[in-house]
Amino acid sequence: MAGPRIDEVKDNAFRLPSRLNSTWGGNFTDMVRSTHYLRIIEQERLVENAAKIGAYFLDQLRDLQTEEPLISAARGRGVFLAFDLPDAKTREEFWHGFFNLGVLTLRSGENSIRFRPALDITAGAIDEAMELMHKFCQQRRK
């Protein structure tokens, strides 16, 4: 299938089996890059930020849940958060409404909205997003 030109590459995948067994295995550039990512995560205390800001974000989503009867099951860990809506149609309405106001969310499952912000998100950015989500919910009820 590969033809004779494959033999022009000394360490091709057919001569060096480890070339095919893993996307990241043995890739020096990716190992160096990953080391830098881990150092940044540690130096900038991104795990701690995700825990602290995530708890704040979840509290805000629970407040939204008390205001908007269609929202239920606000949940999450760190900054990976979600809530449910009654059905896929309602979820699509909320997803589009949030998007049109500039709040980027993800669809999850059949009826969930998911949040997956950057690990360095600030309380100010969450406040801004929550203000827009409250605005959508209020407009929707009119």
Regions found by a protein language model. Give the residues of each.
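Conserved N-terminal phosphate-binding loop of PLP-dependent enzymes in the Aspartate aminotransferase
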Residues: 1-142
